[in-house]
Amino acid sequence: MVKSHIGSWILVLFVAMWSDVGLCKKRPKPGGGWNTGGSRYPGQGSPGGNRYPPQGGGGWGQPHGGGWGQPHGGGWGQPHGGGWGQPHGGGWGQPHGGGGWGQGGTHSQWNKPSKPKTNMKHVAGAAAAGAVVGGLGGYMLGSAMSRPLIHFGNDYEDRYYRENMYRYPNQVYYRPVDQYSNQNNFVHDCVNITVKQHTVTTTTKGENFTETDIKMMERVVEQMCITQYQRESQAYYQRGASVILFSSPPVILLISFLIFLIVG
């Protein structure tokens, strides 16, 4: 009986000590925090003073120490102590004390340099480029190519081409190959739309093409359209082969069996 009483008292003492330690940990430390001697807000100028409410022994509405609307200690709208809108003590937008909104204090966060604005000319240019392709009735723009070296049969045209090849397109417009019955139809349509589009766009910029330019441009674009057709045909057949492979019954059964093993 005595041992049970002793054990109970030891348990009570342990719980009391544990509770006291927990309360000590939760007690605020002196010198910092909200409404204590240390300043937490960056906008304070007077040492040891806070903004909400001011220190000095007074409470809200007291004649000394700073209350709401009091002549001493610094309250809301007071001439001393540094309150909201005061000339001293460092409040919101104040010339002294530092750290207010737009002030010379070292902790101001409102004077950061503004982020650079998006260049709207670049955005508009990108949108316009997308509209050109979309406005051609389903035509796609191929990737850039190196302009082919072509011989035209005489030295004058060969030299003229080498000197002016940079004026000719290095990309072609085309539709998907499955919309054409053969390569000739694809190339014919590709050459017409590419030469027309390049001529109209370049003429709008103030540059004109001669008959020699058109002749050479058609030869250059024709070679690039043939290359584009070969690329698209190869990719099209590869996609078709993949679909046929994965749609065959043996492959479907194998995939189903593997899924069954993984899930099961």
Curated annotation (Swiss-Prot):
Disulfide bonds: C190-C225
Alphabetized InterPro entries for the sequence: Prion, Prion/Doppel_b-ribbon_dom_sf, Prion/Doppel_prot_b-ribbon_dom, Prion_copper_b_octapeptide, Prion_N
Signal peptide range: 1-24
Chain residues that bind Cu(2+) 4: H96, G98, G99
A Gene Ontology BP annotation from the UniProt entry: protein homooligomerization
Role: Its primary physiological function is unclear. Has cytoprotective activity against internal or environmental stresses. May play a role in neuronal development and synaptic plasticity. May be required for neuronal myelin sheath maintenance. May play a role in iron uptake and iron homeostasis. Soluble oligomers are toxic to cultured neuroblastoma cells and induce apoptosis (in vitro). Association with GPC1 (via its heparan sulfate chains) targets PRNP to lipid rafts. Also provides Cu(2+) or Zn(2+) for the ascorbate-mediated GPC1 deaminase degradation of its heparan sulfate side chains.
The protein's name: Major prion protein
Species annotation: Antilope cervicapra (Blackbuck)
Gene: PRNP
